[in-house]
Amino acid sequence: MEGAMAVRVTAAHTAEARAEAGREAGEGGVAAAAALSSGGFLGLPAPFSEEDEDDVHRCGRCQVEFTALEDFVQHKIQKTCHRAPQEALPTTPAATALLDQEVVPTAAEGGPDEPITVAHIVVEATSLAEDISHAPDLVGSGHIKEVIVAAEAEPGDVEMAEAPGSPNHQELGLLGEGEQAHVKLLVNKEGRYVCMLCHKTFKTGSILKAHMVTHSSRKDHECKLCGASFRTKGSLIRHHRRHTDERPYKCAKCGKSFRESGALTRHLKSLTPCTEKIRFSISKDTAVGKEEVPAGSSASTVGTVTSSVAGDPMETSPVIHLVTDAKGTVIHEVHVQMQELPLGMKALTPESPDSEELPCSSENSRENLLHQAMQNSGIVLERVAGEESALEPAPPSGSSPQCLGDGSPELPLLKVEQIETQVASEAATVPRTHPCPQCSETFPTAATLEAHKRGHIAPRPFTCTQCGKAFPKAYLLKKHQEVHVHERRFRCGDCGKLYKTIAHVRGHRRVHSDERPFPCPQCGKRYKTKNAQQVHFRTHLEEKPHVCQFCSRGFREKGSLVRHVRHHTGEKPFKCYKCGRGFAEHGTLNRHLRTKGGCLLEVEELLVSEESPSAAATVLAEDPHTVLVEFSSVVADTQEYIIEATADDTETSEATEIIEGTQTEVDSHIMKVVQQIVHQAGAGHQIIVQNVTMDQETALGSEATAADTITIATPESLTEQVAMTLASAISEGTVLTARAGPNSTEQATVTMVSSEDIEILEHGGELVIASPEGQLEVQTVIV
């Protein structure tokens, strides 16, 4: 039929099918037998019944049909056939449609011609025709299933029709053009479905359907947490475990969990099996008694989990212990930190009697042997309640172990905090006799020293862009970069102190707690942190592992060595933000800031300015008089500045500023006062300089009201300073009035200069003021 493509199924043949090749059934069977005896073949138009369909092998390329499997295989091996034009796979847009149904005709309730769906296959059919036709290695195996599948359609879109030239063959087609495509499913000699794009094999067609999605560019499964998209739902599930840290695949030998089954498989196939790793690792068991298992879990056994950490025996590593019931539900989770104790060290748990001394017995001998082996090996056992409740107190050391409901002995109990404290205390007693030749750090064993030395020679591809320090791992570089972060964004809720990271805040919050869970095993003194307890314990051992490279002095802490080295190098990294002074230690900087008078930034600046004073300050320091300058309200509110200079000390002067009746210390020269209101000289001003006495001050008050006139009354000894002050104040049209000292002369000398002219007008010959290029300059000339 036109506009629709045929759907037919040719089943795979086995040895039994070849044995029945001579069976005759109707007209089609006779024709098949004749073809077999003569070695010929049957053409496509030859009619055959549905029963003979199992005995016919059709070439998918040239559409030639064979009744003998050997002839069909020989035909495929020769590769001499050509594609039949009438049966060629479509090259129309229909070949690009998505395929998702495999349909086989079978006898159903509706009749023998009604098809049923047995599998779903979704593929991109763009290049399947060429890929399928060029697979002689798979086709030549003789086990072929040719399936022409159609795109998924609604029930009303499918109709039955007869193919041209084959009235007895039932075909299934779609009404719309471009809605189906031909796909051959090849089955290898093991009976597995073969993907024609990557040649992977699968057990069923449904698995092949799920696999074919990976060859598509569509990503319909999106993660709701981060927005990443994936082609398959399984990929999304595996990705989601990275957010939840779910590890459903657990090794039955060592208890280690993995996110993916492939990771567990690689773990089991590793060069060093996990059973060997247990002998060199630190183990700890967490057991749940039968009476403590929640309802619904198995009550016949005690659920135990053994966690081990592969690596150096003396290296402390965090271990996560999970207690699960029979269904795999997590009952309790304990975080501990274990370290292997040296030989001869006292065990942490009370000595347990041997198996023959146990008063109770159990039917399960294997379980008893397990408990006995665990106790003899020194493994700490902990019984944890099913709820997240506090641990029960441990039984006294002299008491015999009680029996559980199933007859097994009850496990001795220890709190996790007690385990950490005692292990850390006893680990601190181990002498460190193996120093590193490249740095000053020492180690207790040769194995830990070798592991440390590998860090010196390992490649360091991750380099800090700020200081150039290199690291072998990316997470070490990220942790190091916190040193260069000066911003402190994390605040302690108790005292308000700021820290760079939230981990520092958590460690600091122990200071506000009264709990001291880490006692010294030698003197019993308790500490809030394990590090403080370890540092204190070194005082009993007189151990100083950190040695100075300059003077060979030893220190118990690395920080003490760093502070000591600064005395050799002169480094002072702690700077005062006020005065810029550097200090070698942070505590010294804090004491500097907490001094009674505070940081003397202003006093130090005053001393520096007096060492190299300006010309105006020099003139002012040489004159013993006091000058009062009043700024007019034209610029701002009336402010009074008094600059005093004592006659005894002519080199240094103490400045006093009076602002609205309040007296404070200011700089010693008047230029800092004037420069705040005057920057540029303006045109159109008249300047009057007059030497007056104290009696003439009132007469000058009327002249001070003019905005374009500046009147200055000054003694003759301060003429040069007044000229400099006048040059600074001319641009604003400010009125300045200065009181003269008691030693001023009564004779007045007035000099008037127009700022628009460069011509100098002299009346007294003592002061010359010029205005070149619009900028007013005031110069004094001694006549």
Swiss-Prot record:
Catalytic activity: S-ubiquitinyl-[E2 ubiquitin-conjugating enzyme]-L-cysteine + [acceptor protein]-L-lysine = [E2 ubiquitin-conjugating enzyme]-L-cysteine + N(6)-ubiquitinyl-[acceptor protein]-L-lysine
EC number of this enzyme: 2.3.2.27
Principal subcellular localization: nucleus
Disruption phenotype: Death before 7.5 dpc probably at the peri-implantation stage. Blastocysts display defects in mitotic progression and chromosomal segregation and increased apoptosis.
InterPro entries: Znf_C2H2_sf (IPR036236), Znf_C2H2_type (IPR013087)
Any one Gene Ontology BP term: protein ubiquitination
Span list, region Mediates interaction with CDKN2A: 368-565
Keyword field: Cell cycle, Cell division, Cytoplasm, DNA-binding, Growth regulation, Metal-binding, Mitosis, Nucleus, Phosphoprotein, Repeat, Repressor, Transcription, Transcription regulation, Transferase, Ubl conjugation, Ubl conjugation pathway, Zinc, Zinc-finger
Mediates interaction with TP53: annotated span: 520-579
Record text on subunit structure and interactions: Homodimer; binds DNA as a dimer. Forms a complex with CDKN2A and TP53. Interacts with HDAC1, HMGA2 and RASSF1. Interactions with TP53, RB1, ANP32A and probably BMI1 and FHL2 regulate E4F1 activity.
Protein name: Transcription factor E4F1
